[in-house]
């Protein structure tokens, strides 16, 4: 398998999905702005997404894929099918109970996550109503994660990536054509989430049938694979939930601040997740099955080679992205969201959050790579312990910063904590018997730093010359931003080329650790 080709393909699909996500957010911003009702929607939307990141994209896939990889490589097909069938049965039971619990206690969950809403009847009512509608999304997206993990184990990386497009398409269609039939109109978004969740899982069924893995559920908790899964899932879920608890605490704080705070944080998250999704999620998705295979084959050299390759590739790609995001944040937000009810004040408020998030964007992505390294060697306790420490540290910093930075305090706190998180994880992984760190990191980083400085100079020159011209044409705005990014990015790549870095160095077959 050509890993770099798979990564480019997966990143391109993720890019398309994120662009559709921006179109979705543009329509939301145009239709509803950044107000109390959008705060209610984004809170209600955030809660199932927090649990999705814990159960679906987080703990589940990190534990399930290494065990499935072991079955696929070392067991026969019937044992593998039986393991998947029992995991499916277990998930359906747990998710059904959890969904029923969430719907029944929706009002209490909203009050816990956003106590500031208690004083606003409209916000509380809308958030509760929309949460009841959207909570089943956890059920569908978690089952979609199961099917996606199976397909990833068979190297069908692009199929699960395409499934995320359905949520964005559903919301775009509902905003464009169905909103008028709802009162209040924003309720249409909640139903769009459910429709998108259903299509996310149905779309993958034909591909499961192609690999003979479209299986009916069973329930045997004594299955050896299931027992191994249950032994690890609790620890990983705890570690994954720590980050989400941190976000919930930040949401609680934001609910007491000026109206629109939750919305500004949401829109800034979208831009940050655009970069982390294209590079971090795509790379870790491909990396985890490959690392698990190298561990199952007791191939430490290949394991180290994969991790070192991924870490260096992240640095090459993410550092220039951070520079662009930080330097052009106001222009990007204006282009993406400043329409209709979304005002210039909303642009500035969102920009302030993005600038603090940019500080921690590189470790955000690097941590995803390191976690794949830990989970592939079945070390789930170390990331969990570190994440608990980081949770406490983040909240202490947030308490200190909120007095000075208000709604941007959490972005600053989590960015600084992410650097500490990265260094702790990297140090622990270097101490393991599996990972041999790459040499010449300092020389490599100095080359990137030099290229980044050239890029930054070009960005400022182009920004002052080109962005000073006022225009109301969206096409011209897109064109000039594309030119600024392309010319500055070209300078970055040319500098790296002059310093001796070549694209073919990152073909994995020729990469040396």
UniProtKB/Swiss-Prot annotation:
Per the record, membrane topology reads: Multi-pass membrane protein
Q: Which GO terms describe its cellular component?
A: plasma membrane
On whether Ribosomal protein is a keyword of this UniProt record, the answer is no
Q: Where is the signal peptide?
A: none
Q: Which UniProt keywords apply?
A: Cell inner membrane, Cell membrane, Cell shape, Cell wall biogenesis/degradation, Membrane, Peptidoglycan synthesis, Transmembrane, Transmembrane helix, Transport
Q: Does the keyword Transmembrane apply?
A: yes
Q: Which family does it belong to?
A: Belongs to the MurJ/MviN family.
Protein known as: Probable lipid II flippase MurJ
């Amino acid at each position: 398998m050509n890993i770099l080709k798979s990564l480019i393909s997966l990143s391109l699909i993720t890019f398309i999905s994120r662009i559709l996500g921006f179109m979705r957010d543009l329509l939301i911003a145009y239709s509803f702005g950044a107000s109390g009702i959008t705060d209610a929607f984004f809170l209600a939307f955030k809660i199932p997404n927090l649990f999705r990141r814990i159960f679906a994209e987080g703990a589940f896939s990190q534990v399930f894929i290494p065990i499935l990889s072991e079955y696929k490589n070392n067991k026969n097909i019937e044992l593998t099918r039986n393991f998947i069938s029992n995991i499916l049965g277990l998930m359906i039971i747990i998710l059904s109970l959890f969904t029923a619990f969430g719907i029944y206690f929706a009002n209490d969950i909203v009050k816990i996550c956003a106590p500031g809403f208690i004083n606003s009847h409209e916000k509380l009512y809308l958030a509760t109503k929309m949460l009841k509608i959207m909570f089943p999304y956890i059920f569908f997206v978690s089952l979609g994660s199961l099917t996606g993990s199976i397909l990833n184990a068979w190297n069908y990386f692009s199929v699960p990536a395409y499934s995320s497009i359905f949520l964005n398409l559903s919301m775009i269609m509902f905003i464009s054509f169905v909103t008028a039939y709802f009162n209040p109109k924003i309720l249409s978004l909640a139903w769009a989430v459910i429709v998108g969740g259903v299509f996310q899982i149905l779309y993958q069924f034909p591909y499961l049938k192609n690999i003979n893995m479209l299986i009916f559920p069973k329930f045997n908790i004594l299955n050896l694979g299931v027992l191994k899964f249950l032994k690890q899932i609790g620890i990983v879920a705890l570690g994954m939930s720590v980050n989400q608890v941190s976000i919930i605490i930040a949401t609680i704080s934001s609910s007491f601040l000026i109206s629109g705070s939750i919305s500004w944080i949401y829109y800034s998250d979208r831009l940050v997740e655009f970069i982390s999704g294209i590079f971090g999620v795509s790379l870790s998705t491909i990396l985890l099955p490959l690392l698990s295979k190298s561990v199952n084959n007791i191939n430490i050299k290949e394991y180290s080679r994969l991790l070192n390759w991924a870490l260096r590739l992240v640095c090459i790609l993410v550092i220039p992205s951070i520079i662009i995001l930080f330097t052009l944040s106001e222009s990007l937000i204006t282009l993406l969201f400043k329409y209709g009810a979304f005002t210039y004040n909303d642009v500035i408020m969102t920009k302030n959050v993005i600038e603090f998030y940019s500080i921690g964007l590189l470790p955000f992505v690097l941590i995803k790579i390191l976690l794949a390294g830990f989970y592939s060697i079945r070390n789930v306790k170390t990331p969990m312990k570190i994440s608990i420490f980081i949770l406490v540290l983040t909240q202490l910093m947030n308490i200190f910063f909120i007095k000075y930075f208000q709604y941007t305090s959490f972005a600053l706190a989590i960015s600084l904590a992410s650097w500490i998180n990265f260094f702790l994880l990297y140090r622990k992984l270097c101490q393991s018997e599996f990972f041999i760190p790459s040499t010449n990191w300092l020389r490599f980083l100095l080359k990137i730093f030099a290229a980044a400085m050239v890029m930054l100079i070009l960005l400022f020159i182009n920004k002052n010359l080109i962005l000073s011209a006022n225009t109301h044409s969206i096409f011209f705005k897109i064109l000039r931003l594309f030119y600024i990014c392309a010319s500055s990015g070209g300078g970055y790549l040319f500098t790296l080329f002059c310093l001796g870095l070549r694209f073919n160095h990152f073909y994995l077959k020729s990469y040396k650790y």
